[in-house]
């Protein structure tokens, strides 16, 4: 099947697979939100949160109008008016970022397949990688690609993977732990003299409105990032 400058097919799992762009063979491998994979062949491709691809998905700006291929072959028009956070880990490379997102209702979501091409005008700009429920009849559809100018993205080597932990109410975050605010400073000071040869770790703390990422040696915090949420969560993994 063809649309604009792409050729695509539907695989046995009912997902859309982009086969060619501008008559050049394409590779697009979609990852579950938070998924960790070990496959050295994937390292040769571009990576954006939720996807490994031979295609460079361009930078978009908030409020861009996009068109998404629906299951009946028509194009659904949506607006990038929200943001969300997604990540994956590929060969110990932690790829993460805030992504522009469109809001869809239940009826629209049922018309969309994972892998469906996303266009701005007639140009391919991304693919459908996930959905995130934010209300009874409201979902976020993230649009992955080069970082939107006002958002944050990044990647880092994580030798021991990424631990994901729900950020509990009335807690503050330092390193690998969350504690009440009146205890967190003392805990941080106690880590100053700990051994620098301790095990490295990366922890992602999340709540609906905010994401924290820490990189640590033992309980000593080396880096601490703050970003807006929500975290796109897979249906098959429970984050404690």
UniProtKB/Swiss-Prot annotation:
Q: Where are the transmembrane segments?
A: none
Q: Which UniProt keywords apply?
A: Hydrolase, Nuclease
Spell out the residues of the site Substrate binding: 93, 146, 226
Active site (UniProt): 46, 181, 185
Q: What is its EC number?
A: 3.1.-.-
Can you state which reaction this protein catalyses?
2',3'-cGAMP + H2O = Gp(2'-5')Ap(3') + H(+)
A single Gene Ontology MF term assigned here is: 2',3'-cyclic GMP-AMP binding
The organism's place on the tree of life at top rank: Viruses
Residue span of the signal peptide, if any?
none
**Comment on protein domains:** The substrate binding site is formed by the N-terminus of a monomer and the C-terminus of the opposite monomer.
Assembly information from the UniProt record: Homodimer.
Concerning its family, UniProt says: Belongs to the poxin family.
Per the entry, what this protein does is: Nuclease that cleaves host 2',3'-cGAMP.
Name used for this protein in its record:
Poxin
Organism of origin is Autographa californica nuclear polyhedrosis virus (AcMNPV)
């Amino acid at each position: 099947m063809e649309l604009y400058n792409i050729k695509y097919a539907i695989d046995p799992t009912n997902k859309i697979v982009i086969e060619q762009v501008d008559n050049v063979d394409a590779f697009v491998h979609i990852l579950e939100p938070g998924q960790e994979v070990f496959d050295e062949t994937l390292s040769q491709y571009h990576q954006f949160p939720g996807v490994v691809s031979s295609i460079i998905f361009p930078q978009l700006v908030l409020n861009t109008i996009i068109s998404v291929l629906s299951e009946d072959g028509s194009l659904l028009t949506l607006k990038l008016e929200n943001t969300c956070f997604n990540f994956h880990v590929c060969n110990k490379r932690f790829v993460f970022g805030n992504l522009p997102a469109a809001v869809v209702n239940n009826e629209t979501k049922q018309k969309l397949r994972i892998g469906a091409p996303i266009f701005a005008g007639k140009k391919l700009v991304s693919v459908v990688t996930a959905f995130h429920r934010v209300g009874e009849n409201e979902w976020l559809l993230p649009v992955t690609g080069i970082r939107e100018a006002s958002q944050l993205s990044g990647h880092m080597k994580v030798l021991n993977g990424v631990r994901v932990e729900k950020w509990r109410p009335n807690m503050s975050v330092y390193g690998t732990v969350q504690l009440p605010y009146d205890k967190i400073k003392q805990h941080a000071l106690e880590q100053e003299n700990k051994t620098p040869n301790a095990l490295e770790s990366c922890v992602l703390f999340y709540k609906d409105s905010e994401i924290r990422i820490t990189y640590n040696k033992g309980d000593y915090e080396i880096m601490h990032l703050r970003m807006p949420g929500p975290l796109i969560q897979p249906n098959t993994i429970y984050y404690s």
